[in-house]
């Protein structure tokens, strides 16, 4: 019964992260933080599911590896944007320019 409440809590937190991701379109840092929060909630759901079904947790290690790669790519884009433009506002420059 406790696992069911944990599933509902993780799903609600994932939905809140999605709402923040959709509503914060001005700053790249807020967007990246909400994406990482959503990935963390997906990891917790995956971990609870694998423990509940008595599966091995090797897939969660692969999932975390890809999540770290996604985070590093997002931070590298953030650093390059701050170096070239001085801020992380999406409205201060055109994304389509090279």
Swiss-Prot record:
This is NADH-ubiquinone oxidoreductase chain 4L. Belongs to the complex I subunit 4L family. InterPro entries: NADH_UbQ_OxRdtase_chain4L/K (IPR001133), NUOK/Mnh_C1-like (IPR039428). The gene is mt:ND4L. It comes from the Eukaryota. Its EC number is 7.1.1.2. It holds the Pfam family Oxidored_q2. The chain crosses the membrane at residues 2-22, 28-48, 62-82. One of its GO terms (cellular component) is NADH dehydrogenase complex. Disulfide bonds: none annotated. Its main location: mitochondrion. Signal peptide: none annotated. Core subunit of the mitochondrial membrane respiratory chain NADH dehydrogenase (Complex I) that is believed to belong to the minimal assembly required for catalysis. Complex I functions in the transfer of electrons from NADH to the respiratory chain. The immediate electron acceptor for the enzyme is believed to be ubiquinone. GO terms for biological process: ATP synthesis coupled electron transport. GO terms for molecular function: NADH dehydrogenase (ubiquinone) activity. It catalyses: a ubiquinone + NADH + 5 H(+)(in) = a ubiquinol + NAD(+) + 4 H(+)(out). Keywords: Electron transport, Membrane, Mitochondrion, NAD, Respiratory chain, Translocase, Transmembrane, Transmembrane helix, Transport, Ubiquinone. It is found in: Mitochondrion membrane. It is a multi-pass membrane protein.
């Amino acid at each position: 019964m406790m696992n069911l409440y944990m599933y509902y809590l993780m799903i609600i937190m994932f939905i809140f992260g999605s709402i923040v991701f959709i509503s914060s379109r001005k700053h790249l840092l807020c967007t990246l933080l909400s994406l990482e929060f959503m990935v963390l909630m997906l990891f917790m759901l995956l971990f609870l599911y694998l423990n509940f079904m008595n599966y091995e947790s090797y897939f969660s290690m692969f999932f975390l590896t890809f999540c770290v790669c996604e985070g590093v790519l997002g931070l590298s884009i953030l650093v390059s944007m701050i170096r070239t433009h001085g801020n992380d506002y999406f409205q201060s420059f055109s994304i389509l320019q090279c």
